[in-house]
Amino acid sequence: MGELRPGSGVHYPGSVGELRSWFGTDEDCLDYLDWLRWPEGFVCPRCGHLGGWAVADGGYKCAGCGARTSVTAGTLFDRRRTPLTVWFEACWSFASGKDGMSALSLQRSLEIGSYATAWAMLHRLRSVLVRPGRDRLTGTVEVEETYIGGEEPGLRGGRAKGKKVLVGVAVEVTEPRGFGRARMQILTDASAGTLHPFITAHVEPGARVITDGWTGYQGLDKLGYTHEPRSQRAARARGEDPGGLLPGVHRIASLAKRWLLGTHQGSVQEAHLQSYLDEFVFRFNRRRSRSRGMVFYRLLELAVAHEPVRYRQLVANPQPKRVPPRPPPGGGHPPSLDRPRAARPWRTS
């Protein structure tokens, strides 16, 4: 959005009441997505030409190549069946909940007839939470690995056994005990061939990187980092708790596991774990935001910047494995949430 500084009540709704007043019809929602996607005017997704003509179905015809496109084509909302008014309610619920929400909670709150629909909506939202080209971590950064799904003392990296998933954790640390942004990513093992790419993908060269003494971290200085390894063995020899060497990543890992257990009862399949980690990081990095409306705004910005994810990409089976036995009454897809129409303040700012 360039130099735009979004404001509550102008560029995004400041309350759920304002949300429902602004987005009473799918046409209102489409206009908002149009404004978010092309704030300086229509840009053809096919040829990149600036400018076109609005067509009767609410889309555009490119003035350059003549291609027709809809506002939602190539976005999270492409080929949707659920009304956009319901999607916007789901986005608000997703953004406004401090700890997120389960598919069952979304199904009940919006009276979505199909649990599978609510489940897929949440997973599609999770699929857009990583901004393309996002900035890497800077300053002082702690890096460590952890296991999601259980731990076995004494096992590490490729030597680990059991149904656990190895996850890389990186977090900016500030004095005296503060945290900045975080990153989490599933790792295949804890070798240098895996850890080095994880760090270069998420940490800006020149940063001070603090790790334990694991051999997989050796050589970071050659990649442009100031590497500070901290030996667990030396800490034990000094009578110190080795867990205190990297308090930042241990805190983040603990919060993530607690969040998975509390919000999703720990029932996260490995195939979807990265999406849940992306959601946790999205929420953690916005923990100081005072406006849920701003988080809603950022979420929709991401939604129009990402390619759509199809249902068949989300599941290996025709439906999620855990389907509640008593869905709310109604059809497979909710009706549009009809509301009084309001002005479109984002167009008048």
Label each region the model flagged.
Residues 1-349:
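Residue-level recognition of single "structural anchor" positions
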